[in-house]
């Protein structure tokens, strides 16, 4: 079952697995009674035993034996789990009178994001170095700014969006946002691209433009929409849910470049523009190759190499097209 198509069903069985004392996550494998009640579950079960994990066949054999010999006990346990989920899902009816609505939750969440804001690299620093596109969080900050006039909420949003646009998490040539950055600088992505990330991020960009009317955010949103239309839309109008991180069995191979490859493909003149703009070096920044990223704007780089800015932009566009 596609959990993105039925998140409600996914949520129920995820709660069941956690109630059984197992670690939640995906892929989620849950074994059910004929009536659909959860008996046992977990995430990944390998084809053969390894790292103290039972194989998928081991789990099947165990469950067949248990169901055959202890069906009454299993049924009792499954009903207890269902009762637990039902109770935990029950919420007191709330008065929906608008006068009773509170923005306490928004205020607390805004303060949480503010406290975890990475002032140097932007985005939010929590327990690990990984940084995920915080699209919904940025939308909340925009709403907080709109309601209260809090300038910091807007500044945090703008800085985070720009840091991701210029970082390695964004495919500087083909477009599209990777699933997350494995470092706090937004440089080294997990190269998989998810449809929902790009759609939600586009929404955050459009909402930012609605607030500040700065064309760079509308332009970035348009770039992402073009990427979705070109690479994540099938000929019959359906959407692909993701682009794989691997190319020819190697993670990220399609997205990283050596200096020699760039010079060979682009030619001397165009390469002389692309190499400094995308911070390409002989040594590289990822396993001997380069994840393209931007540290300085085009005007600055054009001035450094002594080129007219208009000519510089033409060569840069030529580099992207090649």
Q: Each predicted region: which residue ranges?
A:
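Replace the tail clause
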Residues: 1-322
